[in-house]
Curated annotation (Swiss-Prot):
Catalytically driven reaction(s): GMP + ATP = GDP + ADP
Name of a matching Pfam family: Guanylate_kin
Name of the top EC class for this enzyme: transferase
UniProt-recorded Gene Ontology molecular function terms: ATP binding; guanylate kinase activity
PROSITE patterns in the record: GUANYLATE_KINASE_1, GUANYLATE_KINASE_2
Protein name per the record: Guanylate kinase
Similarity-based family: Belongs to the guanylate kinase family.
Residues annotated for ATP binding in this entry: G13, P14, S15, G16, V17, G18, K19, G20
Broad class of the protein's primary localization: cytoplasm
Gene name of the encoded protein: gmk
Keywords: ATP-binding, Cytoplasm, Kinase, Nucleotide-binding, Transferase
EC number(s) stated in the UniProt entry for this protein: 2.7.4.8
Amino acid sequence: MKNERGLLIVMSGPSGVGKGTVRKALFSQPDINLHYSVSVTTRKPREGEVEGVDYFFRTREQFEQMIRENKLLEWAEYVGNYYGTPIDYVEKTLAEGKDVFLEIEVQGAMKVRRAFPEALFIFLAPPSLTELEKRIMGRGTESKELIENRLRAAKEELEMMDEYDYVVENDEVELACERIKAIVIAEHCRRERVAERYKRMLGVE
């Protein structure tokens, strides 16, 4: 039994952990009933990334205008690029009783936590630091300096794990997806969420 308002699910984790890979695999499954909120970024598209599907790619000037116009639920600057979440889609979809899935950076997740304390926060973790370094270096699209910056930032982000509700280890993509699906199902059965609907049915404040 679902709440009338949708559940906001926020997944984040360090650079190189495989957030995009897990999200794409999750949304390719036929039984998934989540609505993905596409983020905005000023970084260059990577090979295979599609405008409006993976990200909305914008210039710094365009992004900063969105900040000034309060069009972002959260935004952060990470390794020299802006990342943010358009607010209109999130609010509209939640109000329709649909679950919204955000795949965002750790800095941004902490801002969403302050705005939506009732949201579900999942930290995607690597099986080891060695594996994380291998994944970041294996992209082959970034300079040595940028790789070092990402590694440094990733280690700092791992220390933020305590701020999340659940931790999912991304040792295998399919297993990570199954864990996330199980967490979402369990969260919808949480007493606090279910009780609110019954209180409304019974006319109890």
